From Swiss-Prot:
Gene it is expressed from: cyaY
Keyword Glycoprotein annotated: no
Top-rank taxon, per record: Bacteria
Molecular-function GO term, any one: ferrous iron binding
Originating organism: Stutzerimonas stutzeri (strain A1501)
Lineage: Bacteria, Pseudomonadati, Pseudomonadota, Gammaproteobacteria, Pseudomonadales
Name of this chain's protein: Iron-sulfur cluster assembly protein CyaY
Amino acid sequence: MSLSEARYHDLVDAVQESVEDVFDDTSLDVDLENSGGVLTVRFDNGSQLILSRQPALRQLWVAARSGGFHFDYDEGSQLWLCDASGERLGELLTRVTQEQGGEALEFEDL
């Protein structure tokens, strides 16, 4: 069963809030901007990490220096999973913050 639009938006809101909280609780120097459903993380080296919602597809898209990734929400595991690799969103974010920010942050519940 696919996600309702309301549930989808609630889930993406929660992800973006959690991501912001992780960055707020670290000493990593980043600028955060959340506008129009798009969360942009700017690292001090000029690279960006962008989390954007794709409501028509009920997906969460992540753009990073290493590429673009599309995530579907899995109700069984209650996790966002990459539609190409099956990687958990939290694993990808940890890897990307290491690659782009030089610090592997923990995004455990994503």
